[in-house]
Structure formats: structure tokens, C-alpha cells
């Protein structure tokens, strides 16, 4: 199990360094910038998987996590059902998915509705537009 997590962490760190991140949102109130790597999109019949990077202006903390400056996640979007779920997330000590991985979670979340007027809605639109194109 530890070996698998190490391999996943190294793969994410390596892909972060080589990824071509495109900024899709900046929220000055929250101090976040959200990026998407369109080269990582994986399409199936009705879902799209996409890599997302959330970069923070200030270090973030949660009750059970060490401080982190960015989160690299893979999300899956159901275009017809307007739902989404997080498949994987890695929390990084530095901006843009760099630095030590302070925490990772590879347990897929349950499907949930994409909230209206949210960054997740914008991400869903980007993902599903890519599905419709091809």
C-alpha cells in the first residue's frame, strides 16, 4: 500500500511539473486561483475526468492536515446528470503542486450535484464542453 501511494505521489508530482495549467478562475476574496490541464482530460460515454489545480495565496490549514499551499485533484464530471466527484487529491507544501506532498487521498467521493454559480459549475462546463466537441 505504501509503495502504491509513493508511486501515485511521484506520478502526480512529475505530472505537475510537466503539466500545462490554464487558469480558469481567480477569486480575490478567497485568495485562490484555479487551473485546469486540458491535456489530462479522459472521456467516456457520459463522463469526463480532468486534472484541476487550486493554488492558494496564503497557507491553508484543516484540523487534520499539515499546512498546504496548493491542491492537485482529479475530478470526474457526469455531463448528463450534472454531477461530479473527486477521485484523487494531493495537498502540496508549495504553490502550483510543488513541494512535499503533505497529504493525499485516493478514495473516490460519492457523486454530488454540481452547485450553481460556483467554480465547480465552471469546471463542469469546461469538462462537458470537451466531451461535446469530440
For each of these PLM feature ranges, what is it?
Residues 4-13:
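Sec-dependent N-terminal signal peptides
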Residues 17-134:
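N-terminal secretory-pathway/extracellular module detecting exported/lumenal segments
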Amino acid at each position: 500500500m505504501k509503495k502504491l501511494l509513493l508511486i501515485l505521489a511521484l506520478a502526480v508530482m512529475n505530472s505537475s511539473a510537466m503539466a500545462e495549467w490554464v487558469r480558469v478562475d481567480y477569486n480575490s476574496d478567497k485568495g485562490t486561483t484555479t487551473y485546469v490541464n486540458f491535456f489530462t482530460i479522459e472521456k467516456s460515454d457520459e463522463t469526463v475526468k480532468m486534472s484541476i489545480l487550486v493554488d492558494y495565496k496564503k497557507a491553508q490549514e484543516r484540523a487534520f492536515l499539515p499546512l498546504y499551499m496548493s491542491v492537485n485533484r482529479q475530478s470526474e464530471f457526469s455531463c448528463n446528470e450534472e454531477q461530479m466527484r473527486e477521485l484523487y487529491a494531493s495537498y502540496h507544501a508549495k504553490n502550483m503542486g510543488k513541494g512535499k506532498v503533505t497529504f493525499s487521498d485516493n478514495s473516490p467521493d460519492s457523486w454530488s450535484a454540481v452547485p450553481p454559480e460556483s467554480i465547480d459549475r465552471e469546471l463542469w462546463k469546461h469538462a462537458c464542453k470537451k466531451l461535446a466537441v469530440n
